[in-house]
């Protein structure tokens, strides 16, 4: 088995969070009621756990995710109405092509790829 890391994201509304991540390309692979496991079958994995009242203030949510994908534009097209930065996706000074969205609990989700070094 390869090593991998999986984020466990708290959510006060699992149905809303599930719908959001499905738009990004995830699907539910296991549902335990208050705990759901999502994947895209290409390498992304995510666990959602129900935490009532989390976060108290959405803008105070300290969590973030970076989802690497080759076809950034295809994912952006599925969530274009949610993209935070106008004109995104675009190249960033730190060498990525990316965009950002916020999930229903305020988790910052960046979707991008590393630009060619050539």
List the model feature ranges, each with a label.
Residues 8, 27-34, 90, 116-118:
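Conserved catalytic-core motifs of GNAT/GCN5-like acyltransferases
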Residues 1-16, 63-65, 112-118:
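N-terminal beta-strand motif that seeds the catalytic metal site of vicinal oxygen chelate
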Residues 12-15, 65-108:
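Vicinal oxygen chelate
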Residues 8, 49, 93, 100, ...:
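Short beta->alpha transition motifs characteristic of CBS
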Residues 22-29, 83-84:
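Conserved acetyl-CoA-binding loop of GNAT-fold acetyltransferases
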Residues 27-60, 108-113:
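Conserved short beta-strand elements that form part of the metal-binding/catalytic scaffold
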